[in-house]
Amino acid sequence: MSAVPFSKISTPLNALFATIGLLVVAALTTQGLTGQERLVFELLLAAIWLAYVLQLSGTLLSRRRRLSGEMTALVIDLLAVLVPAAAFLFVGSRDRDLYCAIWLLKPLRDSTFFRLLAKVVANESRNLLGVTSVFGIVLFGAALAGYIIERDVQPDKFGSIPQAMWWAVVTLSTTGYGDEIPQSLAGRVLAGLVMMSGIGIFALWAGILATGFYEEVRRQDFVRNWQLVAAVPLFQKLGSAALIEIVRALRPRIVPAGAVICRKGEVGDQMFFIVEGRVTVATPDHPVELGAGNFFGEMALISGDPRSATVSAATEVSLLSLYAVDFQILSSSSPEIAETIRKTALERRGGPPKE
């Protein structure tokens, strides 16, 4: 079997291999395993390692494609193979299996999450730094107050600010006491205030990151939809302001090959623009194929007529759908867009465009 197909091991399969491997690593640390059981586990680890070797080979053989987009996958594939191999050669038999824990990274090789996380952190760095500064101030203030209040009561635990700082860290980051508990009333009041401050600070961090993720995902969706809309010939002559209105109204949709998009006789509530792929229109005479740049289902928006034909996906097709409600909003806010769609639809049907 060629090594190249192994470069296409899916993310779920990578996760499955990694999960099995890590469970085996955990099992090998238990006491009382027989020699036969240990051998079976070792062979299972070797089989997963060989699968990763084939995946790495496939990745290296397909380097003709863009290098930057696959660099993360290549690095993870290399680590998944080289780290266990180096451990087998240079580490004692007791601990060498533990190095297979590097397979924790395998499910992330095709993930875009860390790129998204890096963008969010970069965008929100000023706010995150501000909250971190507040955390540091509260941390030192809590340690100082704990030292002053508890140093005579518990000198072994609060005898210095560095000692009290451990209590402050634990109290700020958890709800409840850690291994050090204030004994005085003032110390307990301080602990309650520190715990509430910690809840507020971590809520600020979480809120900033959640808002940043939402804004970044929305921005990426807007850029992707803009590119899809700009690829439709019907909209290529429109200005930026009009395109923005369309991007807000159109909704992307992926339809698998063979799926029915709309059926003859149905009451339609949307029209479709083909961005990529082909669809088959079942006309009375013979089927007609439409490709990228074409649209269909427009009469449902213009005249409200039922669907005149059944349309199905000849291949996997990327569509942009415009609902009747959004079409009415576009007609009010940007009449030129609605008029362009209306004229083009009537011309396709052989009728004169309405002036």
From Swiss-Prot:
Swiss-Prot/TrEMBL keywords:
cAMP, cAMP-binding, Cell membrane, Ion channel, Ion transport, Ligand-gated ion channel, Membrane, Nucleotide-binding, Potassium, Potassium channel, Potassium transport, Transmembrane, Transmembrane helix, Transport
What CDD domains does the annotation carry?
A: CAP_ED
Q: Where are the transmembrane segments?
A: 13-30, 39-61, 74-93, 94-111, 129-149, 185-209
Membrane-side (Periplasmic) residue stretches: 31-38, 150-160, 180-184
Which stretches are intramembrane?
161-179
Tell me where in or outside the cell this protein is found. Cell membrane
Which InterPro entries is this protein grouped with? CNG_cation_channel, cNMP-bd_CS, cNMP-bd_dom, cNMP-bd_dom_sf, K_chnl_dom, Nucleotide_channel_N, RmlC-like_jellyroll
Q: Which GO terms describe its molecular function?
A: cAMP binding; intracellularly cyclic nucleotide-activated monoatomic cation channel activity; potassium channel activity; protein-containing complex binding
- The lineage's top-level taxon is Bacteria
Which intervals lie on the Cytoplasmic side per UniProt? 1-12, 62-73, 112-128, 210-355
Please list the residues that bind 3',5'-cyclic AMP.
297-298, 307-308, 348
Q: A cellular component term (GO) from this record? A: plasma membrane
Query: Record's SUPFAM superfamilies?
Result: cAMP-binding domain-like, Voltage-gated potassium channels
Motif Selectivity filter per UniProt: ranges: 174-179
Q: Membrane topology type, per the record?
A: Multi-pass membrane protein
Gene3D superfamilies documented for this protein: 1.10.287.70, 1.20.5.110, Jelly Rolls, Voltage-gated potassium channels
**According to its UniProt record, which protein family does this protein belong to?**
Belongs to the potassium channel family.
According to the record's subunit comment, the protein's assembly and interactions are: Homotetramer.
Instruction: Explain the purpose of this protein.
Output: Cyclic nucleotide-regulated potassium channel activated by cAMP.
This protein is called Cyclic nucleotide-gated potassium channel RHE_CH03180
